[in-house]
């Protein structure tokens, strides 16, 4: 039957025959045969008797060709240049229509081409080139069967049908292109118990690993919380310790401040007593009249003004130096006298302007410490200016009487001593006030950091994470495999079902080479169809049993079985094979990994094919006779046309048949 299949697929056109409108010609031919339908039915009995007498014995020769025994009967009872293989005229040689046919019929009237296409399609749908995996149970009414054994057998077959069907899950719908035919098929994935078990173990392992990870994270969170708690406790203790130190520093600062104020009061009291005593001594020691004192003061002011004027005018400074050294002439002396008169008329240096004095007189001091500090500063400034003017006017003071300087000396010493005491007391007071202010600021800062830490800390703002769409895009959804399909990304066992024959499902061969064509999204599958596979399988089992008979170790048995190559055994029957190629189209891209990884590795398949090609025999094809003789082959042509007509009528709906 496989040889006939190859012959039907080997469609050849000889002698310039046009087959472009073959189907239309066959349809016209079948219309012409309707008028002879009644005559055909009358002769059907005779034809069946003739066909029953025909016997054909097909066997394979050593070279793979078909061997026929007996006599082939034809329609006219005489020898013909072709043989009937599966009811179709075939020959090994190329048909010679001009020499073999006396009255050749057209391709349309012969009906061989369309019949061969129909027979080839039926052969593909019956799955003769595939291994049957599942068969639908017979749907026979149980009431019509009285034999209990048959009923039990049907029930068991139904149970097997249900269990086998449950082991297959539909993958996709697609198209299968084989030769000139295109079939609508469904692909299924066969459930594998080992893969399911392995998948379950992996899921349990992942679940266990996830639980351990979750437990570890929980322990780490607890540990971090404990460390944080301890850190907060340490911070709290440190803060309390700091607060205690601050309290002690504050108390110490207050104590020092009180001592400084007490010391300042004591110094103020002592200073007042000393001033009173000094005034008494000054009054007692003063013997000169007040006029001399005023003169002395005016001379001092004049000298101070001269010094200031000399600092501003370099020429005046040179003039003063000449007069002091006795080098000035009369004109320069007269000029110096005018300068002296001018210096006498000027106000004393350091005299504040009138407006600040009025404001100072009108302002009321609020703090005794501030007034004393300001007065001490003004006195120190006045004394420093006076001392400077005294140093610069040493030349003029040399002409003054000595008694006048000696009398003024105690007063200046007492005044400078008083000013130094005032400045020292003011400096001490300012230092104590500054120290107290620093201590208060530190205490306030620490207390705010310690007690009011929670209130002053800014609230933490949590930025909400952008919402991630839970639903995937349409494209990602389409590319998503189901949980079951993800288990069989590699090593899946695929089953196909023809839409024209849903009672059978066939396994795709594992020892095949699959090729993906991305431009057209198609898969091309090629394999070797061994027609005597059953004989080779029986021989393989006998040899493996013989090789492993004395081996008791299971692993060793498995190793020997895997290493044994039946095609390299010289006693192995010679494989009779045909090369097959089909194309799958319409399969979604997401199933690419399943399709490409569901077959044996290419290197292994290539080695298997090389072994078969080395020792096997490729079956030769037949050539169909698309034209028959109008007289010698009229009965054969009539039978083919009538069968085509019946097939065409079966395809029409019932409503059209009635018309």
From Swiss-Prot:
Keyword Cytoplasm: no
Compositional bias segments (type: Polar residues): 360-375, 422-431
Coiled-coil positions: 191-286
Keyword list, A-Z: Activator, Chromatin regulator, Coiled coil, Nucleus, Transcription, Transcription regulation
GO biological process: endoplasmic reticulum organization
Compartments it resides in: Nucleus
Disulfide bonds: none
Main location: nucleus
Record flagged with keyword Transcription regulation: yes
Alphabetized Pfam families for the sequence: Swc3
Subunit structure: Component of the SWR1 chromatin remodeling complex.
PANTHER family assigned: SWR1-COMPLEX PROTEIN 3
Official protein name in the record: SWR1-complex protein 3
Organism per entry: Candida glabrata (strain ATCC 2001 / BCRC 20586 / JCM 3761 / NBRC 0622 / NRRL Y-65 / CBS 138) (Yeast)
């Amino acid at each position: 039957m496989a040889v006939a299949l190859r012959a039907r697929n080997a469609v050849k056109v000889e002698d310039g025959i046009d087959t472009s409108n073959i189907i239309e010609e066959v349809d016209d031919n079948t219309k012409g045969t309707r008028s002879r339908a009644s005559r055909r039915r009358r002769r059907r009995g005779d034809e069946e008797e003739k066909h029953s007498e025909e016997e054909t014995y097909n066997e394979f020769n050593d070279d793979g060709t078909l061997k026929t025994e007996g006599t082939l009967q034809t329609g006219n009872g005489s020898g013909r240049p072709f043989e009937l293989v599966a009811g179709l005229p075939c020959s090994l040689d190329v048909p010679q229509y001009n020499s073999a046919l006396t009255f050749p019929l057209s391709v349309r009237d012969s009906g061989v081409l369309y019949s061969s296409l129909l027979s080839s399609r039926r052969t593909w749908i019956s799955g003769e080139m595939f291994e049957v995996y599942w068969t639908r149970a017979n749907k026979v009414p149980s009431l019509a069967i009285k034999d209990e054994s048959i009923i039990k057998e049907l029930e068991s077959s139904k149970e097997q049908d249900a269990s086998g069907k449950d082991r297959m899950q539909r993958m996709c719908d697609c198209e299968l292109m084989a030769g000139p035919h295109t079939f609508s098929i469904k692909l299924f994935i066969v459930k594998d118990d080992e893969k399911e078990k392995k998948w379950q173990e992996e899921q349990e392992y992942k679940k266990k690993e996830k639980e351990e990870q979750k437990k570890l994270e929980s322990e780490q969170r607890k540990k971090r919380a404990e460390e944080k708690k301890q850190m907060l406790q340490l911070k709290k203790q440190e803060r309390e310790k700091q607060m205690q130190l601050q309290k002690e520093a504050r108390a110490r600062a207050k104590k020092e401040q009180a001592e400084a104020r007490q010391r300042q009061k004591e110094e103020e009291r002592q200073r007042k007593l000393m001033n009173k005593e000094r005034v008494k001594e000054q009054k007692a020691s003063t013997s000169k009249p007040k006029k001399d004192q005023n003169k002395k003061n005016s001379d001092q002011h004049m000298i101070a003004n001269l010094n200031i004027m000399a600092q501003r005018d370099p020429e005046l400074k040179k003039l003063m130096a000449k007069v002091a050294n006795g080098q000035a002439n009369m004109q320069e002396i007269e000029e110096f006298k005018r300068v002296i008169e001018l210096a006498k008329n000027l106000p004393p240096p350091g005299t504040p302007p009138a407006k600040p004095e009025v404001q100072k007189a009108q302002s009321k001091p609020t703090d005794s410490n501030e007034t004393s500090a300001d007065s001490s500063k003004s006195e120190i400034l006045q004394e420093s200016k006076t001392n400077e003017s005294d140093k610069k006017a040493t030349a003029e003071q040399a002409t003054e009487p000595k008694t006048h300087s000696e009398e003024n000396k105690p007063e200046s010493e007492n005044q400078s001593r008083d000013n130094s005491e005032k400045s020292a007391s003011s400096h001490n007071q300012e230092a104590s006030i500054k120290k107290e202010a620093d201590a208060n600021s530190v205490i306030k800062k620490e207390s705010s950091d310690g007690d009011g830490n929670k209130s002053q800390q800014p609230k933490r703002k949590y930025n909400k994470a952008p919402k991630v769409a839970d639903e995937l895009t349409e494209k990602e959804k389409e590319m998503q495999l189901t949980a079951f399909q993800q288990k069989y990304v590699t090593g899946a066992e695929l089953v196909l079902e023809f839409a024209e024959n849903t009672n059978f499902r066939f396994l795709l061969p594992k020892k095949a080479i699959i090729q993906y064509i991305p431009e057209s999204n198609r898969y091309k599958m090629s394999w070797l169809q061994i027609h005597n596979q059953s004989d080779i399988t029986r021989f393989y089992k006998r040899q493996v049993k013989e090789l492993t008979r004395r081996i008791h170790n299971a692993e060793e048995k498995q190793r020997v079985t895997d290493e044994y190559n039946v095609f390299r055994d010289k006693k192995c029957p010679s494989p009779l094979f045909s090369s097959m190629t089909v194309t799958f189209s319409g399969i979604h891209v997401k199933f690419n990994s399943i399709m490409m990884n569901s077959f044996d590795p290419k290197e292994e398949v290539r080695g298997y094919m090389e072994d078969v090609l080395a020792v096997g025999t490729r079956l030769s094809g037949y050539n169909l006779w698309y034209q028959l003789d109008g007289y010698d082959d009229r009965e054969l042509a009539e039978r083919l046309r009538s069968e085509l007509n019946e097939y065409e009528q079966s395809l029409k709906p019932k409503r059209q048949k009635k018309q």
